[in-house]
Amino acid sequence: PITLAIQCSKLNIHYTYLGTGCIFLADDPTKSMYNEDALPDFFGSSYSVVKGYTDRLMHNFNDSVLNVRIRMPITADYNPRNFITKITTYSKVCSIPNSMTVLPELLPIMIKMMESKKVGTINLTNPGLISHNEILQMYKEIVNPKFTWENFTVEEQNKILLSKRSNNQLDNTKLKEWYPEVLPIKDSIRKCLEDMAIHNTTKNGGGCSIN
C-alpha cells in the first residue's frame, strides 16, 4: 500500500486505501470515540499492528490518498466473512458494543468518495454502536425464531483465542457531514436481516435492500 501511495502521489493519481478501524481498544466503547486523527492504541494481534502502522503512514499522504477505516463488515449473505454469519456460528459469544460497517450501504458511498476524489482518513462505519447480543436478538426475531446462543466474558474469550480482539467506537462526525443520509447501525443491520429472511440468502445470495 505504501509503494502505491508514493507512486500515486508522484503521478498525481487519486488512491483509495481500504484499511480497518480495528486498531483501537476501548475498555468501554460507550464512553469514548476515536476520530480520524486518533493514533492506533491496540497491539493485541499481528494484524492490528501491521494495519495500525499502515494507517499512520497513510496520514502522510492526506493530499492524495483516501484512507478508509471499516469495522466488522456486514452483508445479508451467508458468507463466512460476514460478521453476522460469524457470530451465529460461534459456540459462545462475547457481547460488546462496537462500531460496524454495513457494506451494501457504505461501499456505494465509498465509491462516491473515490469519484469525487476525497482525500484524508474517514471512519466508514454506520453511526452508533450495536452489541453482538443485540444483533443476535434481531436475528432471532427476524430470521430464525429457534436460534439460541450462549455468552462468555472477555476474560474467558482471551483464554481460547490466539490473539485479543479490538473493541471501539469510531467517531462518525465527518462521515455524517459528508453523507447525512447514512443510516444508524441498528437500522441498517435490521434491513440486512429483513433481506435475509425474505430472500433466503442461504441458497440464493443477495445483499441488504438499501439504496
What are these regions (language model features)?
Residues 1-16:
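NAD(P)-cofactor binding segment of oxidoreductase domains
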Residues 7-11, 61, 143:
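Helix C-cap/helix->beta junction micro-motif
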Residues 14, 22-68, 75:
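Catalytic helix-loop patch of NAD(P)-dependent Rossmann-fold dehydrogenases
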Residues 19-21, 69-71, 125:
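Active-site beta-alpha turn of Rossmann-fold NAD(P)-dependent dehydrogenases/reductases
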Residues 31-41, 85-91, 156:
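Short glycine/proline- and charge-enriched loop/turn segments
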Residues 56-108, 112:
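NAD(P)-dependent short-chain dehydrogenase/reductase
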Residues 98-101, 130, 170, 180-183:
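Residue-level signal for the nucleotide or nucleotide-sugar donor/cofactor binding architecture
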Residues 109-167, 191, 200-211:
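Mid/C-terminal beta-alpha module of Rossmann-like enzyme folds, strongest
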